[in-house]
């Protein structure tokens, strides 16, 4: 069995990498992938704590997060396709101006 602190360390490392990608990158696709990395790091911690406390609720909550994330990715990729067709760019700075 893997010690709890290894799982927490992995989750924190992935969270920091994902947060860095969200805050530092200007490509919307990279930001979306970094956001997915953030959510998966949270899932690792849910499962690790569920295993440590011998409770299945951590795994159930991780499954719900995965389902919600799948829906979020589907919507975000649809928006990205529409954005590329209209603006021909994926830069965050070029998309911030909203016109009616």
Swiss-Prot record:
Q: How does it assemble?
A: NDH-1 is composed of 14 different subunits. Subunits NuoA, H, J, K, L, M, N constitute the membrane sector of the complex.
Q: For this UniProt entry, what is the primary localization, expressed as one broad class?
A: membrane
Report membrane topology.
Multi-pass membrane protein
Q: Name one GO biological process term.
A: ATP synthesis coupled electron transport
What name goes with this protein? NADH-quinone oxidoreductase subunit K 2
Q: Which organism is it from?
A: Rhizobium meliloti (strain 1021) (Ensifer meliloti)
Task: Indicate whether NAD appears among the record's keywords.
Answer: yes
Reactions performed catalytically: a quinone + NADH + 5 H(+)(in) = a quinol + NAD(+) + 4 H(+)(out)
Compartments, as annotated in UniProt? Cell inner membrane
Return the HAMAP family for the record. Answer: NDH1_NuoK
Q: Does the keyword Cell inner membrane apply?
A: yes
Q: InterPro entries of this UniProt entry?
A: NADH_UbQ_OxRdtase_chain4L/K, NUOK/Mnh_C1-like
State the similarity comment.
Belongs to the complex I subunit 4L family.
* Pfam families membership: Oxidored_q2
Return the GO cellular component terms, semicolon-separated: NADH dehydrogenase complex; plasma membrane
* Membrane-crossing residue ranges in chain numbering: 4-24, 28-48, 60-80
- Molecular function GO labels: NADH:ubiquinone reductase (non-electrogenic) activity; quinone binding
Alphabetically sorted, this entry's keywords are:
Cell inner membrane, Cell membrane, Membrane, NAD, Plasmid, Quinone, Translocase, Transmembrane, Transmembrane helix, Transport, Ubiquinone
| EC identifiers of the protein | 7.1.1.-
- Briefly, what is this protein's role? NDH-1 shuttles electrons from NADH, via FMN and iron-sulfur (Fe-S) centers, to quinones in the respiratory chain. The immediate electron acceptor for the enzyme in this species is believed to be ubiquinone. Couples the redox reaction to proton translocation (for every two electrons transferred, four hydrogen ions are translocated across the cytoplasmic membrane), and thus conserves the redox energy in a proton gradient.
Q: Which residues form a coiled coil?
A: none
Q: Which domain of life is it from?
A: Bacteria
List the Gene3D superfamilies hit by this protein, alphabetically: 1.10.287.3510
